[in-house]
Every structure is written in structure tokens, then in C-alpha cells.
Design a protein with these regions (language model features):
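Conserved Switch II/interswitch segment of TRAFAC-class P-loop GTPases
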Residues: 52-53, 59-64, 73-97, 101-123
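P-loop/Walker A NTP-binding module and the surrounding RecA-like catalytic core of P-loop NTPases
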Residues: 4-8, 12-20, 64-70, 88-91, ...
Length: 623
């Protein structure tokens, strides 16, 4: 399927032409049919001789409904431009072409209607000249009459040629469906419709609306139920548990987590045909912006149109043809999106705005706007991988994809430790060499400083290591530690071979070890430990070093003691009581109970009932 929007002056026969092509009335409202005037978007479809199905979005031509017109034109990949033979090129023809040009649409057909009322030649010649100076360039043209049917077969042939040359959408792309209608169906609930430009929607999918998950209950396209719909297509999506008041034209249904929302974008202005005509001398070359007074054009309150949404926008000039746009609400945009700036007061399209950056740097210092403008010279709307990573120091691959970095560029970096451009790959992150070296140096210094400050605990915890380097992700600690020649063990980063220095407590620790070697189950009391200089910090360090095992109730044993206990318990009649275990181990309840609970936790013993345990497996002394 392909989707084509109409464009042209009011009452030039757009709806009549769509009706003649499809046999369907595109005007949905009784008032539209009564007045013979399209007010809102209309929809119809047909099957061409080639078998290709084409959906039409019929847009209103009247100046008062230009917002509705832009909502229909924005998501469409091609346009059917209509001019009446008996009226020729008119004001709304010019404004609609300005919108087409601002959006950069390159695929279209010119249809001169009402050829049964007047010679179509003059209107055809003028319209061709106007379109040739726009992004459409030289397009196929035909004179038709929706009343007599003259030229309709040729138009259908031209439509077939047009759709066969439209770009093939990426059906694996993330979904962004700009909503142009929402309504309810009894027994089904809320339905939204829109033009799906790329990607695939399936029944049962979880998508996202204003940051909240929504579930796809059912799908229709061109009046038929589908289990999945692939772009490009007109699609109706039945959403579960979404009130009709919670979704409206201008909302976007998107792939969860795949579309960052933004209130601020840096853009390049693309002149509309109206702005060029307003300022241009007759010898202006197409695309020449030198004479356009953007300060005049951008004065006052402007509206930004993108997809099906229209929002007021604050414009801040950056360079000769670049501006920063700030919106009152966050939108799911990416670099490369084409938008329209319109002056509602003067009722005309001012410019197109090509999105260059959806995550631009703050402009805090004096002169920062001019510096930013110079940085954007040559930016194309396809984000450069190295530029985006360099500006941030480090960036997740998923975030770069969401910013609009081409998938093939990101795929080429997959599996590499270093990209050809010198970026470092660590898991899902790409890092500049400078930032990577900074992390390595900071982590090394932090580990050394911690060792000096805490000789009992030479290891830096993962979170402390992350904070020391200002890492954006704790999972980067391991890769940075390896690069620094450090050791990551049991969740701590150390110098290789580093061990706690117990200082004066070393003698006390050896005394403890000596006592427990002679009497493994005779755990010393807290006063004994204190006399040896072994407080909580020293014992915690000794446990991390593998020299002691700490159990509940301040019971301190050797790490081998549980295995020694199992030798004794295995020899008991099974099951056994706590008292029997205590007597066999020749120890106290203070030691026996936490020791048995420890054996339970390791799966070596298990409770049979409230008073009995049994051995499950006898470990070796090295267990």
C-alpha cells in the first residue's frame, strides 16, 4: 500500500477527484457534503491496475482549515496536487505548495481538474512552473474531469508509475504513528487512525502513548481486519483501556523506549515558496537564502507543525539559516524530521525546519548561540556518530539510534572494541578515547586513595568506583578496571594481589586463628575479641580476606568450620535435635544455633520439623 495526500486551492475539485478515483465519498461530515466544502481530513482508497492499493488523504483547501491540511499532508510520502482549469493558480495553491516544499516532498502528480469547463493549457503551464521551483521539481501532469471522466485512465496510470517509484519503507523500524483521528466504537472502545510511515504494528503489541503503555486490541487497514500492518499504510488501531478523551489528533503512538521526547530542537530553515516569493528578486536562484530576512520572517508567535501536531514555538536564531525551537510540550522527534513553521497571524507558511539535533547543548554563556550556529554549519539532519558521541563523551547505542544515527552506522560498530573512528565500545556504550582515558585515570587514583585511607579495606565497591569516575552505568566498571590493570573480585576493585593491612590487629587475628584451630567450635566472646583488638571493621576485613567466617550473634569461626561440623553431624542418628548437635560439637547454644542455620542456608542440612534436622549432603573440607 501507499498513501497519497491531496493539495490545492479550496473548491478546485480535490474531493471530486478522489471520489472519481475511488468510488468513495471522502467528506465524512454532513456539513461538508451540505456546503460542498472539505473542512477536515477525508479518507478513501482504491486498487490500481497494477494491483497496488493506494489510500488517499483528502485535505481541506480553505485557508481557515490550513491546520487540518498540514495534519494530513505531514505524514504522507507523496502528493496529488490539484489546480482547476477554470481558475488557475490561486492563493491557497501557493500556500499548499509552500507546505509541500517546506516538508521536502519529492514525489507527486499534478492534476488540472475541470478540463471540461475551460482550456486546461494555461493552468497546466503555470502550475508546472510553480511546482518545478519547489521540492517536487518536474512532475507528471494530466488534465482531467471528475464529472466526465476525461483523463481519469491516464491519471490512474500516472498513479501506478508514482507508487512504483516511492521509497520502500523499513518495516523493522521503530513505530511512530501520528494520530489524525480518535473515536469510539461500541463494544470495542477507543480507535485511533493515522498514516504509518514505517515499522510494523501487530495485534497484542504494547506501544506507548504520552509515556504510558497501551495495548493493541485490533487492527484495520482499508476497512479490513489485520493481525499486523506494515508501513506505508493507513491504519486504525483499537487500543485497550484507553479513554477516547485521553488521545487526540497530534498525539503519537510509538515503540516503547525507542523515541526520546524533547522540548528543544536545533533546526535548519528550509525556505518555503511563499517566503522566497515574498523576498526574492526575479533573478533569484532556487535555494538561495541570502536575501531572505529571517529576522522579519521569524518575528511574532509561530506555530510548529510536525506529523499531525501543531504547537506554538519560541524561535531563537543561531546562525544564518539555523534556529533553536522550544516547545511547551515534549514531542517524539528525531534528527532528519521535517517540520513546518507557520505564521498564523499573517496566515502563511514561513519556512520548513529540518531537525538537526533533538538533544542540543544548553546555551548558557554569552555568545553561545553564535558558537552553536557555527557548529551546525554543514549538519545534514543525519546525525554523525562521532560528533554525537564526542559531544557527550559517552553514549548508549540505543540512545544514538533514538537520536537518528543510521542503524547501519551503529551496526558497523557492533562487536568492535574500537571503531574505525577511534571510539571505544564497551557493552552497549560508545566512548571517546579522551573520556575513556579519563575514566581509567580516575579509577586508578580512586583505588589507590582508598587503599591508603582504608588499609583494612583496600577494595573499592562498584558503586564507589562508578561515582569516582562519574560513570553513566555501573556495568562499565569492569571494562574500565581491566583497562586500568585493576582486579575486580567479589564486587570490589583492587590492585592485583592487594590484601588488607591489619596493622596492630594482625597479632590479635593470629591469636583468634590459633584458638579456633585448637577448638573449632569454641567461638570467643565479644570481650575476648575486643582484647585482641578485633572490632567490627577488623573482622569485616578479615572475612573479606577469607580468614574468618562471621555468623549471627557475633559468632566468629574459621571458614573451614562448617565442613568440620558436617563430619560430626553426619555421624549422628538422623534426624537429630539441636541439643544433640550441640553436644556432639561440644559447643554452646550461642554457637550451635547460628552454625546450624548457616548449614541450612548452604543446603547441607534441612529442618524436618520444629525440633529436628537431617543431613542432606556431606561436603569436603574444601567446600
Amino acid at each position: 500500500m501507499q498513501v497519497i495526500a491531496t493539495a490545492g486551492h479550496v473548491d478546485h475539485g480535490k474531493s471530486t477527484l478522489v471520489r472519481a478515483l475511488t468510488g468513495t465519498e471522502p467528506d465524512r461530515w454532513a456539513e461538508e457534503r451540505r456546503r460542498g466544502l472539505t473542512i477536515d481530513l477525508g479518507y478513501a482508497w482504491t486498487t490500481l491496475g497494477s494491483g497496488e492499493r493506494v489510500a488517499f488523504v483528502d485535505v481541506p483547501g480553505h485557508q481557515r482549515f490550513i491546520g487540518n491540511m498540514l495534519a494530513g499532508l505531514g505524514p504522507a510520502p507523496a502528493v496529488l496536487f490539484v489546480v482547476a482549469a477554470d481558475e488557475g493558480w490561486r492563493r491557497q495553491s501557493q500556500e499548499h505548495l509552500a507546505a509541500v516544499n517546506a516538508l521536502g516532498l519529492r514525489h507527486g502528480i499534478l492534476a488540472v481538474t475541470r478540463s471540461d469547463r475551460a482550456d486546461p493549457g494555461p493552468a497546466l503551464a503555470e502550475a508546472r512552473a510553480q511546482l518545478a521551483a519547489s521540492s517536487l521539481g518536474e512532475v507528471a501532469a494530466v488534465a482531467v474531469s471528475g464529472t466526465t471522466g476525461s483523463g481519469m485512465d491516464e491519471l490512474r496510470q500516472l498513479l501506478g508509475d508514482l507508487v512504483s517509484h516511492l521509497p520502500t519503507p523499513d518495516r523493522a523500524a521503530r513505530v511512530r504513528l501520528w494520530v489524525d483521528r480518535s473515536f469510539t466504537i461500541r463494544g470495542s472502545g477507543t480507535v485511533v487512525t493515522g498514516t504509518l510511515g514505517a515499522g510494523t504494528i501487530r495485534v497484542g503489541d504494547t506501544l506507548e502513548l504520552r509515556g504510558e503503555p497501551v495495548r493493541v486490541r485490533a487492527l484495520q487497514s482499508l476497512g479490513q481486519d489485520h493481525q499486523q500492518v506494515q508501513g506505508v499504510a493507513r491504519v486504525a488501531v483499537n487500543l485497550r483501556q484507553v479513554a477516547v478523551d485521553d488521545v487526540a489528533r497530534g498525539d503519537a503512538i510509538v515503540t516503547p523506549g525507542a523515541w526520546p521526547t524533547t522540548r528543544t530542537v536545533d533546526t535548519r530553515l528550509m525556505p518555503s515558496t511563499m517566503a522566497v516569493a515574498h523576498h526574492a528578486p526575479t533573478d533569484r536562484q532556487p535555494g538561495d537564502l541570502s536575501e531572505i530576512r529571517w529576522s522579519d520572517e521569524l518575528a511574532g508567535e509561530l506555530m510548529l507543525h510536525v506529523g499531525t501536531v501543531a504547537v506554538p514555538v519560541h524561535v531563537r536564531p543561531l546562525g544564518p539559516d539555523t534556529v533553536r525551537l522550544t516547545m511547551p510540550q515534549a514531542l517524539p522527534l528525531q534528527a532528519g524530521d521535517r517540520t513546518i513553521l507557520r505564521d498564523p497571524g499573517r496566515q502563511r507558511v514561513v519556512a520548513g525546519a529540518l531537525v538537526l539535533d533533538v538533544d542540543p547543548p544548553a546555551l548558557r554563556r554569552r555568545g553561545a548561540a553564535a558558537v552553536r550556529g557555527r557548529q551546525l554549519v554543514g549538519a545534514s539532519g543525519a546525525p554523525d556518530l562521532v560528533t554525537e558521541v564526542s559531544r557527550r563523551g559517552a553514549a548508549r547505542v540505543a540512545d544514538l539510534a533514538a537520536l537518528g544515527v543510521p542503524e547501519e552506522v551503529l551496526a558497523s560498530a557492533a562487536g568492535l572494541v574500537r571503531t574505525p573512528s577511534g571510539l571505544r565500545r564497551a557493552g552497549e556504550w560508545l566512548v571517546t578515547p579522551q573520556r575513556w582515558r579519563q575514566w581509567v585515570d580516575h579509577l586508578t587514583a580512586a583505588v589507590d586513595a582508598h587503599t591508603v585511607a582504608s588499609p583494612l579495606d583496600p577494595g573499592l565497591s562498584l558503586e564507589a568506583a562508578r561515582r569516582a569516575c562519574a560513570l553513566p552505568d555501573i556495568r562499565l566498571v569492569g571494562a574500565v578496571a581491566r583497562e586500568a590493570g585493576l582486579q575486580l573480585d567479589v564486587g570490589r576493585v583492587t590492585r592485583p594481589g592487594a590484601a588488607p593491612s591489619f596493622g596492630p590487629a594482625e597479632a590479635g587475628l593470629r591469636a583468634l586463628e590459633s584458638r579456633l584451630q585448637e577448638a573449632p567450635f569454641d567461638a570467643p566472646e565479644r570481650p575476648d575479641l575486643a582484647r585482641w583488638g578485633l572490632g567490627p571493621r577488623e573482622l569485616a576485613a578479615a572475612e573479606r580476606a577469607g580468614r574468618v567466617l562471621r555468623l549471627a550473634d557475633d559468632v566468629v569461626l574459621l571458614p573451614v568450620t562448617p565442613a568440620l561440623a558436617m563430619r560430626v553431624l553426619t555421624a549422628l542418628p538422623q534426624p537429630f535435635t539441636t541439643s544433640a548437635a550441640r553436644q556432639a560439637l561440644t559447643t554452646t547454644r550461642r554457637v550451635a544455633i547460628p552454625l546450624l542455620e548457616h548449614l541450612d542456608s548452604r543446603g547441607w542440612t534441612r529442618r524436618v520439623d520444629g525440633g529436628h534436622r537431617e543431613v542432606r549432603g556431606a561436603p569436603s573440607l574444601t567446600s
